[in-house]
Every structure is written in structure tokens, then in C-alpha cells.
Amino acid sequence: MSQRSTKMGDTIAAIATASGAAGIGIIRISGSQIKTIATGLGMTTLRPRYAHYTRFLDVDDQVIDDGLAIWFPAPHSFTGEDVLELQGHGSPLLLRQLLTRCLDLGARQARPGEFSERAFLNGKLDLIQAEAIADMIGAADLRAARAARRSLDGVFSRRCEALAQQLVRLRIHVEATIDFADESLDTLDRAQIRTSLQTLNVELTQLLRDAEHGKRLCDGLYTVLVGPPNVGKSSLLNALIGSDRAIVTDVPGTTRDTLRESVHFHGLEFVLVDTAGLRGEGDAIEREGMRRTLNELQRADLALVVLDACDPQIGSLALADALTSVPRVLWIHNKLDLLTEPPSVLDTDVIPVSAMTGAGLDTLKTRLRTLLLGETVETIEGEFSARLRHVQALQRTAAHVTDANAQFSYEHLELTAEELRLAYKALGEINGSMSPDELLGRIFSNFCIGK
């Protein structure tokens, strides 16, 4: 039995609303001691899913607060256990006093994310849906919130489950032929397995692409500004975010550390990272800044290579090498206002701008939006939220399917079946069916207390 099983009989409680004073505050309780706690608070009768107005009493029958109590009996509750929600005034002092009373009556303080964890362990949610709750709460824009809503509704889960069933059927088919190893694989069986492998690969590739898109929607496009010193990277960052966040001087090498700012263009989130200019000289601190610049490029979704429009030279072999591993690169010719003649730019990946006057910034923002969403936005209704671990698990799944295809080409049926088993295992990590306890602990520990 899993160490994280909820079959331990304990009852958990936590404040479920945000910290600070508010009109309403909620305490959520889940577990087998609900009726004992309700009685201790002064409630004698509770009807399922009915809002009871009541007074919440302390050990001396003094009123802590008054409000509504709602009982959700198991298994028809969020966690799958008996759940009691207490809705009172949003005073932090009163909420803490009421929570303490619940703990005195037999509950314990819930861990971060423990309510969602219990919902997962009791089969009320899969892991994708549990994570979608946190993604919806933390969404920085409406589109990301709607994508998280679709994951909570099961859009991502159903696609993963469909692929898992295909993997199972295909593995059964392959293993059935192993019993006849002394016979050559007939043409019909060979064609069916080959077609199934190809179909699986196509659908996995599409799901991986959609998951990468979902991750960008939730996390924002991680966009790193790089280039030689004194080309206006910090000025461009300030212009894009609309404030003087980065220090700007005429002295090359002013920026020596990375600076991150989240910004929204067209309702979409971007994480902009200003970095130290790359050149072959500088003191120890500046060299450390350049090292950090190269490290940032390793995690970048997009690199904005900022060059001086008057002399657009990259000037760094290290930067040129690092850019080869970045998924998307956009070239920015800054200081457009200093040109005596209009720029003759033919490359669509080059955008002339002026951080000083704002010329070209709207074009840049529109291009950034296109890079995040793709060339079309016709897939809005199918969008779902995703995380880095989902993308990585799909990548491992796809790699095993590719290896299965290769092994099948050599009629290595045992190895083909094994690769399909490993693909199924990797895919199962996404919805939690194959996730170890340690991974579950890390995931739920990042949730809010009370969720």
C-alpha cells in the first residue's frame, strides 16, 4: 500500500481562502471525524449539501464566529471523503481561532495540496486534473485560465488515455506473435503492426506539440535578450515592459547579472530575461555575467538577439554556438533612430526597432504573440494546460515508440514489446498511474494550503 494512502483515518483541516482580511473566509475539513468536529462546534444536525446558518462555538460555548456550514458526505465530495466547509467572516484572527478549535477537536493541519492529493488518491481526479487546479489558480491571463479549465475537464487526460490504450493493444498484438517465433511473421500481421506504430507516432507527435504549446500558455514564453555589450538590450527590456526596470548607461558591460520580468502582450504572458553582453574580455564579475547569459540560453524558448542597427555584428563565437540549441531565434536591429537611411531588411526573422522612440515595438510584440501561439490560432478550443514534466514524459514516450519501430524493422519482437512497455510506463507518469510517491509529494507540496 502506498505510504501516501489516505486510509489512515485522520482528518485534515485548513483555511481555504487567501490570507488577509476579506468579506468571507472558509475553513475546509476532510476525513472521518467530521461529525465529531461539527458537534464540538455546536452543530447538532447536518443535511447533506445544505447550507446551515450556525454559530461556531469554542470549548466554553462562547461564540467564535457565525456563518454557514455545508456537509458533503463521502464519496460525493471533492476529496471522496466526508467534507465540511465552514464559511465565516474573513477575519484572519477569527479564522485562526476557528481552525485551532477544529484541530483541538481531532483534526490536524493539512499539508499544502493535501485536499487535492486525497482527491487524486481516492480516484476523484487524475494527476493532470489535480495539477490543472493549481494552474487555474495561478493563471496570469484568461487564455491560460481557460486552458487549465480544459485540463481540469479532462481534455488532456482523455488524449493520454487513448494513446495508452493504443499502446496496450499494440503490445498485446506483438506479444501474441512471439508465441510463434519459429514461424515468419505473415505479411498481414507485419502491415498491421507497422501501420499501428506509424499511427501511434503521428498522434504522439501531435500531442507533444500541443503539450509544449500548453506549457508556454501556462509558464509564458521564456524569452532571453542576448547580444554584444551596449546594443540596447536593457533599453529594449524597459521599453517592452513600460518601466525603467533595468539600469541603462553608455558604458559597455553595465548589465552584469540576469534580470527577469513578466509582461503581457495581447493577453499572453512572456518572461523577458535581460542578460550581460557577450564579448571576449572583461573583469571577473563581467565574465561571470557572460557565463550566466549562456546558461539562460540553455533554458530559453526564444532568443532575442539584439544588435546595433548601425553595425549588426554578433561579435561572439560563444553566442553563435549557443544559439544553435535555442528552439526559436529572432534578430532585433536596435537603434533604428540613429540610421541616416531606412533599413533594407529582407529577412523576416529580423525586426528593426528603436527602444528610444518605440518604433517597431508593435511589430515585435505581434511577432512574439505569433511565436507563442503558432502561425494560426484556430486551436483555441482544443488548448489545454501542461507542465514541463508532461512534456518530458511525452518525449520519453515518443523515444520508446521510435525505438519500438526500429526493433520491429529487424523483427526483434521481444525488444519491440519491451519498448512498448516502457512507452506505456512513461505515458502513465503523466496522469499519475505510474508515478512514484516521491514525485507525487513534490507535485502536491507546491499547491496552496487548503487546496
From Swiss-Prot:
Subcellular location as annotated: Cytoplasm
Keyword Cytoplasm: yes
Keyword terms of this UniProt record: Cytoplasm, GTP-binding, Hydrolase, Magnesium, Metal-binding, Nucleotide-binding, Potassium, tRNA processing
GO CC annotations on file: cytosol
Xref: Pfam families: MMR_HSR1, MnmE_helical, TrmE_N
Cofactor note: Binds 1 potassium ion per subunit.
Residues engaged in binding (6S)-5-formyl-5,6,7,8-tetrahydrofolate: 28, 85, 124, 451
Coiled coil regions, renumbered to chain: none
Residue positions binding K(+): 230, 249, 251, 254
Alphabetized InterPro entries for the sequence: G_TrmE, GTP-bd, GTP-bd_TrmE_N, GTPase_MnmE, MnmE_dom2, MnmE_helical, P-loop_NTPase, Small_GTP-bd
Single Gene Ontology MF annotation: metal ion binding
Record has Zinc-finger as a keyword: no
NCBIfam families in UniProt: mnmE_trmE_thdF (TIGR00450), PRK05291.1-3 (NF003661), small_GTP (TIGR00231)
Assembly and interaction partners: Homodimer. Heterotetramer of two MnmE and two MnmG subunits.
Name used for this protein in its record: tRNA modification GTPase MnmE
Lineage: Bacteria, Pseudomonadati, Pseudomonadota, Gammaproteobacteria, Lysobacterales
